């Protein structure tokens, strides 16, 4: 069978090794003379959760993080976040949104800079134009906010 779904392949990957690979890539980019040294991360769904985790793991080496409907990190990890966060959520995403109240409380309690948006009438994956969940107007708005956020935080 030549085709396997992303979820099947995802289950075959060691999550700790994948996180280490992502961290290595971020460290490489931060040290490369071909970059500004100001790193921003973004991701969607699983990648949104990884964006939150990278903000924790990278500390001051991450300068902006934009998770799209990603799992939140545990409250005890929030103090390690140094980057400002722009967080995008679908309004109809009970599994992911269930973690938001505790995450928001931890971000506030630790004085973290963040902005969160819930897009009315959208479902998890609203930015993916290859699925029926795609919401063009919400995706366009979220993407414009993302680009503006990166411009504000990654350019001197």
Enumerate the predicted regions with their spans.
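Short, small-residue-biased leader/transition segments that mark boundaries at the very start
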Residues: 1-2
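Alpha/beta-hydrolase active-site loop
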Residues: 6-33, 144
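C-terminal catalytic histidine-bearing segment of alpha/beta-hydrolase fold enzymes
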Residues: 104, 108-156
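Short beta-strand/loop motif that positions the catalytic acidic residue
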Residues: 81, 86-89
């Amino acid at each position: 069978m030549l085709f396997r779904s992303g979820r099947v392949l995802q289950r075959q990957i060691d999550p700790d090794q994948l996180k280490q690979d992502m961290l290595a890539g971020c460290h490489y980019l931060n040290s490369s003379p071909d970059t500004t040294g100001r790193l921003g991360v973004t991701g969607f769904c699983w990648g949104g959760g990884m964006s939150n985790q990278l903000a924790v793991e990278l500390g001051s080496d991450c300068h902006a993080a934009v998770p799209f409907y990603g799992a939140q990190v545990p409250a005890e990890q929030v103090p390690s976040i140094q980057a400002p966060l722009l967080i995008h959520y679908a309004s109809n995403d009970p599994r992911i949104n269930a973690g938001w109240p505790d995450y928001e409380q931890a971000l506030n309690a630790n004085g973290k800079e963040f902005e969160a948006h819930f897009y009315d009438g959208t479902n998890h994956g609203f930015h993916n134009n290859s699925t029926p969940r795609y919401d063009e107007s919400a995706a366009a708005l979220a993407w414009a906010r993302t680009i503006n956020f990166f411009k504000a935080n990654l350019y001197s």
